[in-house]
């Protein structure tokens, strides 16, 4: 969250609401009935954490309202009735959801005006394009969204319920196989950090597995909060490989490369060349080193041989949805 015209968000925090597991544990602490974001994260030991956004779609409106309240009053410190608001939504967000969002903004927060933009379209704007295909992968959901002259093509947007959270779960599982135990929500956050700091995507998975067997070049160590040091090797690239091979975690879905290709093939034959040449990565789960090269290699193998393929991975892609929103909301044409 932040202000239009800024080049980076002012506030970045997880969409989590935590409630005390046992009432009255923290006597005299002036205990709140709910904590949001980082505070919920840091007090997770005594809280039950809930994620009001599931697979990119809001599923718990009471908690979502708490998150928005926290954003306006604690993070940005603005009066929501003072300025127009730009919100973003997942592709294929049900109309009823958009209406509910609008209703809460106008009735609870008394916003003077609001607009709801599709996340992938904003990422494309942030990359300086109006035509292309965006692979947007966050914590709960991934989408491939073909966009032509600023308009998303809804018939060609597959939703892939495979994203950051699944990769964290998978890493927890394969680290357990190595003899480390991570089970609680608190430990899951540690594993998420390991994932973000040490994972990468192999250009050739089979070859990387062989390398890992014979040499220790892929091994890295990580210090846990309690001072214990763990060593992680092939897990580094086995974790995000799931994006290309969902069958590794028992999912029947196509990988992100195939999903992108299928999405392009659902579009009019005349615009495919523009899509192949403008494949834009967006979201935190596209931050793995090596992802653009691998994506390019896989799409090249699927596409017609003469086709020029370009995969763009902007350095700021973790926040490109927000950056696109900042650009859009500061246009004078948009404000009218």
Curated annotation (Swiss-Prot):
Question: SUPFAM superfamilies per the record?
Answer: Actin-like ATPase domain
Catalytic reaction list: ATP + H2O = ADP + phosphate + H(+)
State the family it belongs to. Belongs to the actin family.
UniProt KW keywords = ATP-binding, Cytoplasm, Cytoskeleton, Hydrolase, Nucleotide-binding
One GO molecular-function entry: hydrolase activity
Under Gene3D superfamilies, the record lists:
3.30.420.40, Actin, Chain A, domain 4 (3.90.640.10)
Write down the superkingdom of origin: Eukaryota
Q: What is this protein called?
A: Actin-52
Keyword check for tRNA processing: no
Other remarks on this protein: There are at least 5 different actin genes in tomato.
Q: Gene Ontology terms, cellular component aspect? A: actin cytoskeleton; cytoplasm
Q: Where in the cell is it found?
A: Cytoplasm, Cytoskeleton
Pfam assignment, any one: Actin
- Role of this protein: Actins are highly conserved proteins that are involved in various types of cell motility and are ubiquitously expressed in all eukaryotic cells. Essential component of cell cytoskeleton; plays an important role in cytoplasmic streaming, cell shape determination, cell division, organelle movement and extension growth.
Which InterPro entries does this entry report, sorted A to Z? Answer: Actin, Actin/actin-like_CS, Actin_CS, ATPase_NBD
List all membrane-crossing ranges.
none
EC number(s) recorded for this UniProt protein: 3.6.4.-
């Amino acid at each position: 969250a932040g202000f239009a015209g800024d080049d980076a968000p002012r506030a970045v925090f997880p969409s989590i609401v935590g409630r005390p597991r046992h009432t009255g544990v923290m006597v005299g602490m002036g205990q709140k009935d709910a904590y949001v974001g980082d505070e919920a994260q840091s007090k997770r030991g005594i809280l039950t954490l809930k994620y009001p956004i599931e697979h990119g779609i809001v599923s718990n409106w009471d908690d979502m309202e708490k998150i928005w309240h926290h954003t306006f009053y604690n993070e940005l410190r603005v009066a929501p009735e003072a300025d127009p608001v730009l919100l973003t939504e997942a592709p294929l967000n049900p109309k009823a959801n958009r209406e509910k969002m609008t209703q809460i903004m106008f009735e609870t927060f008394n916003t003077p005006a609001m607009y709801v933009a599709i996340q992938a379209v904003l990422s494309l704007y942030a990359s300086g394009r109006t035509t292309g295909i965006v692979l947007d992968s966050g914590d709960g959901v991934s989408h491939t969204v073909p966009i032509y002259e600023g308009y998303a093509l809804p018939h060609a947007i597959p939703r892939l319920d495979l994203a950051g959270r699944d990769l964290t779960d998978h890493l927890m599982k394969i680290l357990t196989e190595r003899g480390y135990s991570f089970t609680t929500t608190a430990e899951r956050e540690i594993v998420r950090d390991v994932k973000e700091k040490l994972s990468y995507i192999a250009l050739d998975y089979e070859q990387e597995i062989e390398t890992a067997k014979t040499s220790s070049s892929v091994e890295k160590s990580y210090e846990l909060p309690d001072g214990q040091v763990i060593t992680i090797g092939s897990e580094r690239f086995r974790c995000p490989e799931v994006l290309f091979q969902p069958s590794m975690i028992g999912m029947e879905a196509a990988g992100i490369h195939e999903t992108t290709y299928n999405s392009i093939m659902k579009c009019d034959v005349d615009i495919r060349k523009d899509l192949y040449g403008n494949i834009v990565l967006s979201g935190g789960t596209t931050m793995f080193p090596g992802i653009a090269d691998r994506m390019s290699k896989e799409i090249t193998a699927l596409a017609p041989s003469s086709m020029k393929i370009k995969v763009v991975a902007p350095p700021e892609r973790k926040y490109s949805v927000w950056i696109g929103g900042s650009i859009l909301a500061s246009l004078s044409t948009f404000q009218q």
